[in-house]
Curated annotation (Swiss-Prot):
Name this polypeptide is given: Deoxyribose-phosphate aldolase
Catalytic residue list: D102 (proton donor/acceptor), K165 (schiff-base intermediate with acetaldehyde), K197 (proton donor/acceptor)
Enzyme Commission identifier(s): 4.1.2.4
Superkingdom, natural source: Bacteria
Enzyme class: lyase
GO cellular component: cytoplasm
Gene name of the encoded protein: deoC
GO MF assignments: deoxyribose-phosphate aldolase activity
Species this protein is from: Shewanella sp. (strain MR-7)
Amino acid sequence: MTDLKKAAQRAIELMDLTTLNDDDTDQKVIDLCHKAVTPAGNTAAICIYPRFIPIARKTLDELGAEDIQIATVTNFPHGNDDIAIAVLETRAAVAYGADEVDVVFPYRALMEGNETVGYELVKACKEACGEVLLKVIIESGVLADPALIRRASELSIDAGADFIKTSTGKVPVNATLEAAEIMLTVISEKNTKVGFKPAGGVRDAAQAAEFLGVAERILGADWVSPRTFRFGASSLLNSLLHTLELADAPKPTQGY
């Protein structure tokens, strides 16, 4: 197997296959569940809006794919600074049956100099999650400033995040190697049990390999696993399957 094929295989096993569109329906989520069961093995998770969790759970059970985790989003996509609403949404997501919650950090508040609300929001949402995994989306493409990307990562980890995630996929700049370098360095300094999720903008096996390479350089090859590394993506899967010669070439897409 070539290095590119190895990267494609790993990326599928590390993928949160995502649909977070305004026109999502039960049928689109059912289709997503079927796609997550690939000829190259199952993706790590699917990521969907909370209201679709019950139909996703039913579908994955019917497919015998109980190992695929169900992730959802809260305080999404704008990262508002209302802690009470973020906590209510997170509690509701857990009640729906989410295995993982991706919450948006109040990044605009941080840009305005308020560090406290981000820390408190993540801390409160982690408490609401209990044993459910909490990923914190810092929206690195909007923060832009390396110092702000670093600070959002530090605050999230200090507040109890299980993962830090680059992006919502709803802004012009999503996952970048520069942001990955900063975020993974913070993980190496603070707590190597915390995971990292680049989301949006990873289009093919070559790009996936670049992100994996940064993680391995900073934290070691043994660190990378579904417990510590995920790709958030919608259009990436078809490209990876094509690399593995298990699907036709993907059509151009604007997908996440």
